[in-house]
Swiss-Prot record:
Biased composition (Low complexity): 11-38, 101-122, 137-147, 215-236, 329-344, 407-424, 436-446, 479-523, 530-550, 568-581, 593-602, 649-689, 703-718, 736-758, 766-781
Region Disordered, residue ranges: 1-838
Swiss-Prot/TrEMBL keywords: Calcium, Collagen, Extracellular matrix, Hydroxylation, Repeat, Secreted
Record-given protein name: Collagen alpha-2(I) chain
The keyword Nucleotidyltransferase belongs to this UniProt entry's keyword annotation: no
InterPro entries noted in UniProt: Collagen, Collagen_superfamily
Post-translational modifications: Prolines at the third position of the tripeptide repeating unit (G-X-Y) are hydroxylated in some or all of the chains.
Gene field: COL1A2
Compartments, record wording: Secreted; Secreted, Extracellular space; Secreted, Extracellular space, Extracellular matrix
Amino acid sequence: GPMGIMGPRGFQGPAGEPGEPGQTGPAGARGPAGPPGKAGEDGHPGKPGRPGERGVVGPQGARGHNGIDGIKGQAGAPGVKGARGIPGERGRVGAPGPAGSRGSDGSVGPVGPAGPIGSAGPPGFPGAPGPKGEIGPVGNTGPAGPAGPRGKGAAGIPGVAGPRGIPGPVGASGATGARGIVGEPGPAGSKGEPGSAGPQGPPGPSGEEGKRGPNGESGSSGPTGPPGIRGSRGIPGADGRAGVMGPAGARGASGPTGVRGPSGDTGRPGEPGIMGPRGKEGPVGIPGIDGRVGPAGPAGEAGNIGFPGPKGPTGDPGKVGEKGHAGIAGNRGAPGPDGNNGAQGPPGPQGVQGGKGEQGPAGPPGFQGIPGPAGTTGEVGKPGERGITGEFGIPGPAGPRGERGPPGESGAAGPSGPIGSRGPSGPPGPDGNKGEPGVVGAPGTAGPAGSGGIPGERGAAGMPGGKGEKGETGIRGEVGTTGRDGARGAPGAVGAPGPAGATGDRGEAGAAGPAGPAGPRGTPGERGEVGPAGPNGFAGPAGAAGQPGAKGERGENGVVGPTGPIGSAGPAGPDGTPGPAGSRGDGGPPGVTGFPGAAGRTGPPGPSGITGPPGPPGAAGKRGDQGPVGRSGETGAGGPPGFTGEKGTAGPQGIIGAPGIIGIPGSRGIPGVSGSVGEPGPIGISGPPGARGPSGGVGNPGVNGAPGEAGRDGNPGNDGPPGRDGIPGHKGERGYAGNPGPVGAAGAPGPHGSVGPAGKHGNRGEPGPVGSVGPVGAIGPRNGIQGIPGIAGQHGDQGAPGSVGPAGPRGPAGPGGPPGKDGRTGHPGTVGPAGIRS
């Protein structure tokens, strides 16, 4: 029975929560612009889906009794082509899926291995069979039309199979018409256009139309019997008339929910959404010190794809239209020229500028600058005169602590030090807060048309045409009278080869004789008419294999005896021992070229299968090109100077020694010899402050002091004005072509189609193998008399099936698959050049 209608498809589970986006890392110092990064490698293609399970084949209907053979009539003239039946109503088409973008014509990939056959599903309810329609007469074959361009559509939506009709009675067989004269071949047409048809042969005489046999009664459903013995080939009868189309069968009950089918073709990405409004500007954050560029974070995983809406109801199946007679396929037209590249479309509108992001946390402090060069050492001053040692005074009490003076003026900014080398990458910063989802953007304008695809590969050579039918057997000639022996004359011309004689018993091989002189080549005889085919003989018992005889000498040609009756072919005996190689025989006349057989008719396309569920989402797209690097903002204003540190406390006062005893005044001594200058004594206790001396001259420049400690970080400065737009980056290189997707899994088998009309009889079979050589005749005179023509051989066995016809036309385009997932996040590109300060 017909297969049940496929049940509704189950809903897809809801999409999971998308992961929180990573927080923004600290801003690094902008390095020099690097070359644009290469496009990332394509992602691995997804695994093909599991093939669907095959449904259970419905029970086979009961076979009707064979009708009574009609009276054999003569072949009738070709009837008028019957009117085409009313086409059935077409089922409602479901909502179209997104159209897939057409790719370039790729080379034909290898056919993948067939998937495993799934377990059988429950059988569907059989529909009510419709009445048997009469077969219409075959119309005259029209001229071949020009071959249309080869379409490249997607797989069509399979239709629901209609009910299977009850086979009607076998029509009466008509007599075979006389073979028409083969027409002259038409002149060769221009390339791509069909050649003109040759003149049609004269039609055979009109025969009586065979009477239609009674309809067979529908038998009860029984087990399938063993195959019967193949009968002899019947004579084709006259074509019947087309019957009235039966009513549509009752709609079968909905079957269970079908198993998910194989993966569908990857759909093209959806249109870009409308750009969301500009987000609210957040509060101004504390600007951090320019940090170093952190390492690139791992690529985020693509979010889950949304689940599609519920599938619409399936339309009622349309009525099956009557099958029209297919015309002879025309010659294939020449391929058209490659189309020109389409004009480039206008650029899309510029998107709204996004809002300013939140300020990231402060980065680590920068490295300490390199100290400046040391100053030159000044000249050593002249030593001053030694002062008079003062008396020890009593130290005064410590004065009150002075007030803190006002802060000094900020020093002028020193010259910028050399640019330090790039430090190691800092640790990745914490992930930023999750941003609000933007509104779907408006669809962008269409991009420029792609260039023309590469010309497809040349198609494979077509199947060789079927072998033409064998001509009719001519009338058997009369037996000639036996002539008298004449005088021995010169060797005569070689006569035409006589018909093959019956296969005799295998004799013993004689010894090879000396080769005789080669006679002159005779003129080939005229081809005789083939006689009618005789009845098939019965197989005789197998003969025992004889022992190979000794190699005898070649004897003279004997008198040809009368041809015996054709014996029935016995079964093949066991293989004998191969005999010695015989001498090469004379070449036979060239064979006559056979007539080309009639072109077979293209069968009707089978019913469309049930639409499979949409395939899984496509693989992730390849990484996008590196975008232009924006310029950096201006440097913020410097912070206020740091506070001056407090003055340290004075150390403890030393202990004052006791005054010494005053000695007796000595006498005036005689000045002695000046001694050598002694070592400088220890520094005495500071005396009271002396009077302010005169101002000294300008001293030499002092030596540069050691670099002071870094001051504390100043307060954050205000945000600088937004910088000007940077120079657009270089246009990225064109990405590499993606790898071809995986070969799709084999689809689930469609429902059993309705039984088509009976095909044409096959071509006559190849001639049987050459019979074995008969025994050598008795030695006769040199010139033998003309032999009696042998009886015509039997017909060969049934020929092998003809070659496969051309493939049918492609079905209509199927619905596109669901939109693919978003591609993986690309790796950050190299840092661009620093922007120009305004």
